[in-house]
Amino acid sequence: MKDLLKFLKAQTKTEEFDSIKIGLASPDMIRSWSFGEVKKPETINYRTFKPERDGLFCARIFGPVKDYECLCGKYKRLKHRGVICEKCGVEVTQTKVRRERMGHIELASPTAHIWFLKSLPSRIGLLLDMTLRDIERVLYFESYVVIEPGMTNLERSQMLSEEQYLDALEEWGDEFDAKMGAEAILALLRAIDLEGEVRTMREELDQTNSETKRKKTTKRLKLMEAFLQSGNKPEWMIMTVLPVLPPDLRPLVPLDGGRFATSDLNDLYRRVINRNNRLKRLLDLAAPDIIVRNEKRMLQESVDALLDNGRRGRAITGSNKRPLKSLADMIKGKQGRFRQNLLGKRVDYSGRSVITVGPTLRLHQCGLPKKMALELFKPFIYGKLESRGLATTIKAAKKMVEREEAVVWDILDEVIREHPVLLNRAPTLHRLGIQAFEPTLIEGKAIQLHPLVCAAYNADFDGDQMAVHVPLTLEAQLEARALMMSTNNILSPASGEPIIVPSQDVVLGLYYMTRARINAKGEGMVLSGPKEAEKVYRAGLADLHARVKVRITEYLRQEDGSLRAHTEMKNTTVGRAILSLILPKGMEYALIDEPKVLTAAEQADLDANPQNWIKSVSNKALGKKLISRLLNTCYRKQGLKDTVIFADQLMYTGFHYAALSGASVGIDDMVIPDAKKDIIAAAEAEVAEIQDQFLSGLVTAGERYNKVIDIWASANERVSKAMMENLSKERNVNSLGEEEEQASFNSIFMMADSGARGSAAQIRQLAGMRGLMAKPDGSIIETPIVANFREGLNVLQYFISTHGARKGLADTALKTANSGYLTRRLVDVAQDMVITEDDCGTTEGLWMTPLIEGGDVVEPLRERVLGRVVADDVIKPGTEDEVLVARNTLLDEQLCDLLERNSVDRVKVRSAITCETDFGNCAHCYGRDLARGHLVNKGEAVGVIAAQSIGEPGTQLTMRTFHIGGAASRAAAESSIQVKNTGSIKLQNAKFVHNSDDKLVITSRSTELTIMDEMGRTKESHKLPYGSVLEVKDGQAVNAGETVANWDPHTHPIITEVAGRLHFEHMIDGVTITRQTDELTGLSSIVVLDVNERPSAGKEMRPTVKLVDLNGKDVMIPGTDVAAQYFLPGKAIVNLEDGANVGVGDAVARIPQESGGTKDITGGLPRVADLFEARQPKEPAILAEISGTISFGKETKGKRRLVITPTDGGDVYEEMIPKWRNLNVFEGEKVEKGEVLADGPESAHDILRLRGISPVANYIANEVQDVYRLQGVKINDKHIEVIVRQMLRKCEILSAGDTDLIEGEQVEVARVKIANRKLVAEGKTPATFRHILMGITKASLSTESFISAASFQETTRVLTEAAVGGKRDELRGLKENVIVGRLIPAGTGFAYHHGRINQRAAAARAVGVPQVTADEAQQNLADLLNAAGSFDEE
């Protein structure tokens, strides 16, 4: 019998499926699921609590209420399994079948399924080519629709009102057929001939020219084809049978006092059954039409409410005035089935408690309270007690544990040993929010946490709580130990920098012990080694900071990896020598004590007086940055184990010496500079002066405000500078009797200087002045707070302060929610991005160059290419073919050094965006796994890691939109370029002419001036505006600080390209121009009138300046046959007279430029969200659609017609541009495709369309990085690239070729590529397409997997679309697999999935049998059960 049961269990296994298909259910299908028809609205008998027969909880239909017991009690026990009771008709089986057996309701009149009717675009409407309004009028019995026109002049699906219908009846009798209600729609849907329609529509598409018609036809065509391919029939969108959910999924629970708690679904079903039964009765009675009609409409409404309450009309409410929860509400939203139960499950074996510091723990340990451990590990303890024979049964073991006998604790110790537990702190923003530790038992009730992992958890000990989870199975323990142990997560997956970095006390302790103090006790000693230094210090003979000579033995790593000892005397301090004791072998001493770089004079002094060696001791102490670098170097050189031990040792040492340092903060530590009074008095005087100027009308209110704020901002700077100088330096006499300067030992200064806590800005508020405050709207209050916290604030100052503080709190709350939502969208778009193969073999890639803004290198090349794979051989600069790095090599630290030594400044690297893998990404295109430091493994979920890396720092980004102005970002209008580096000038995309002084005048808009060093590396780059005058030539050498270019920032010149005499055309005084004379200088100038200021005679005229030679003939622009003529736009100013002579490079006219004004720059989180959502900016830059020559056509009201004539003689391109846009181009100028014509924020869509994939990737990556860099957050570019790849997943079909795609359709690129490969192999025409950029929300919703999309947002819409198209979900991504309850196809599950797929394929090949379908399995099971029943009888 047991074997049979096992066999049965094996039979019902349905895990073996490869994909899930969703479709429309036909009435027959619904009947086949059902175990009987629900005929009555009754639920259960309120006295006996037994379900009513034929009701919503009927036991005959849905199964027994108690295990193996029929309702009337005739058959009980297991032996009657499978018997159907003659009396009550209930099958004797397990009660859990009530969770899976469905019923059905036969509807007396067909009803439309609201999802296919109302979910836009209405599927029924599309198929019938009727508007939703019309269909609703038919469905809700307001008008008739013609179904069969017969021999009349009516059309099929024509609407008829009541009167029209009666007239038609009189005229034609029963020649035609017209109905109302769902029956009519059902008949229309049945009559559709899909194949015929598809044929006619494809022909229509080929013939039509109108865009709107094309779009509409394409939509219909896609829908029809979906129906054809999926095997759905259109009439199934109208329901004639309604399925009934199994009763245990809509429970009814008796409460005490004779009341019941029930699921809303029961109410909705009751309503449907009541109306349906009433309708049946009315139809039997042949009631009047109007009554039947009303009943049918009510039935339709109740079915609507059951499926999706509130979708149409007012939602049906329950007794508590709340809308009832319908079937659709059950699955959608945060509380729906997908997000609440399938994606987020609660787990057993977990506990939570407050955390405290565990300064004595090792990095892989955590302290677990005994009580907690005992509870969590109970099953293991029971097992151990039994196997040891200490307890005979589980029950006895349980008693022992409850009594907490002594032996139980010993066993708990054994059980816990080497059994890791997971610690998690909410919110888990990235994968380091859950890590594994080995528990050690502690007294008390709080969990102890190692201080170094706090950064990863973002935890502090002010009452944070953490949860503990126990991995149960051996595999889970193994994964926890090998992958999640805190010692295996030293590097951050976001940037590849160490995340196990000491902070606060530890940093302060290490900083304190590595400081040097002048004339400390024991200065000038000579010691035999670090051990002796420690002895001397412990004995109190020398101070920790004393400058001494110590014999240090370093172990240096050789080329072959072996260690070589090297001993020498070092001038250092006692503390640094002691610290060197914990330095791992193989790391040089210079890492903790950088030798001081001596000037020539100091070196000479030292040679002359050797006793002055004290002065050569470096005065640099270990700060936070240096410690981080120390750990990073250790990881790269020494590997994981040494780093972990070293980090722990650093922590213990740091805590120890921080305690000994006795650093504390007293009020006297906040030293207020003496100069403060004078500085503030001077600022007040300046402000008073400006106020006077304002009152006498010399400056405007706006200028006054800005100047006042400038004055106070600079005063604040001066005060804080004075204060820091005062705080940070002190002078002392050394042992040689000379005075030396040293860094101060002021506690506050040490904390800030070491990076332990606080910053210069905070010290400024304590001891300088608080400075300017902002109002909640972001504008700056012009009276600053001149007091600091040491002096104390008065009431007014305190009140001003609260403004900013309150805004900060409100911002933070909003920010957290926004940031979480951004992370959720990112995870959703990238969740199926997994490394699926080793190398896709592509030669494509992105060009990487150092990021340079003005004169500063923001990000050097090495940081951008470290950990990437080279796409092409890197050639040594200056040679033709000497290969430095071969293609497909992973660039590690050594290779990056090699590139730097050879001054390479562009490298083509492989990128996720250019990867050719169909699904997922390949390891070579991704490069290094940042958290592990080697090439990424197959199965790594790089998409989720990317999303977490971008989302996790989201809460640190600001929410503000920055106003330019105030002290936020004051940049005076630039008017010249001063170079910061020495090097040679190089001009890029320059067009220029030489003027009369033989200086270059720039005549193009995209000119860049770069400074190259002698190795040919770019040091800085500047944009040169049109009309700037260069002081230098291309290729000339310049020195740092030289001014190389000048221009007038307030006007925009028009530059001549040839010499000649001026000739004015259409320049008529009072019509197109007006003359103005400057009162001060007496010079007159001509100002061109704007079109709308001219009289009607001058509207069409175009004022022009022509250049003519002495004979009055037009002068041509060299190398072209275009006459040199310059059209003058409105407001242009001409300072020359008609007939004046001009040279090359002179300005014939100037156009005044309004200064930028206060445009808001969107910053922070909103900016990142805008970029990833690929939103169109408000006024985007206008880019040239084709390459060619610019000219202007006829103007219209408010718009200019811009014409580009292509150089290769193709079609002319025209665009209407609003007049107020500042154009960057003039008539006759040549532009390249994708060049900026009118300034503004560039739109990512335009960049992709006109410049291609690589530029759009660079644009998004750089813009996102700008936001993060401002906050000092480091994120690797490749994470952003992974997201961009997902945004570029879709393409638009341009021509279909021999595929069955439709032009203009949006399809996954991978699909098209696969189809094209097949076509090319068969020698047919492939489809052509162009990439499109989708925002992350849209991309998530349009993924191939409908399960993933439905669990993200807009569940109804996604499921409706998927059902109509009969979509199949291949379960490729992570989300789908979590939802169906499988291992995810990433990480350790990657191999499992591949094995499974291969196994199934092999099995199918071996047997050659088709897979068993679900129905067959069901049948087999039924046969077996019946057979089982017959065994028992014997």
Curated annotation (Swiss-Prot):
Pfam families xrefs: RNA_pol_Rpb1_1, RNA_pol_Rpb1_2, RNA_pol_Rpb1_3, RNA_pol_Rpb1_4, RNA_pol_Rpb1_5
Gene Ontology CC terms: DNA-directed RNA polymerase complex
CC cofactor note: Binds 1 Mg(2+) ion per subunit.
Single GO MF annotation: zinc ion binding
Recorded superkingdom: Bacteria
UniProt source species: Aeromonas hydrophila subsp. hydrophila (strain ATCC 7966 / DSM 30187 / BCRC 13018 / CCUG 14551 / JCM 1027 / KCTC 2358 / NCIMB 9240 / NCTC 8049)
Described function: DNA-dependent RNA polymerase catalyzes the transcription of DNA into RNA using the four ribonucleoside triphosphates as substrates.
Enzyme class: transferase
Catalytically driven reaction(s): RNA(n) + a ribonucleoside 5'-triphosphate = RNA(n+1) + diphosphate
Protein name from the UniProt record: DNA-directed RNA polymerase subunit beta'
Cofactor(s) it depends on: Mg(2+); Zn(2+)
Family as reported in the entry's similarity comment: Belongs to the RNA polymerase beta' chain family.
Alphabetical list of CDD domains matching this protein: RNAP_beta'_C (cd02655), RNAP_beta'_N (cd01609)
Residues binding Zn(2+) 1: C70, C72, C85, C88
The keyword Kinase belongs to this UniProt entry's keyword annotation: no
Residues that bind Zn(2+) 2: C840, C915, C922, C925
Protein residues bound to Mg(2+): D460, D462, D464
GO biological-process terms attached to the record: DNA-templated transcription
Gene3D superfamilies: 1.10.132.30, 1.10.150.390, 1.10.1790.20, 1.10.40.90, 2.40.40.20, 2.40.50.100, RNA polymerase II, clamp domain, RNA polymerase Rpb1, domain 3
Subunit structure: The RNAP catalytic core consists of 2 alpha, 1 beta, 1 beta' and 1 omega subunit. When a sigma factor is associated with the core the holoenzyme is formed, which can initiate transcription.
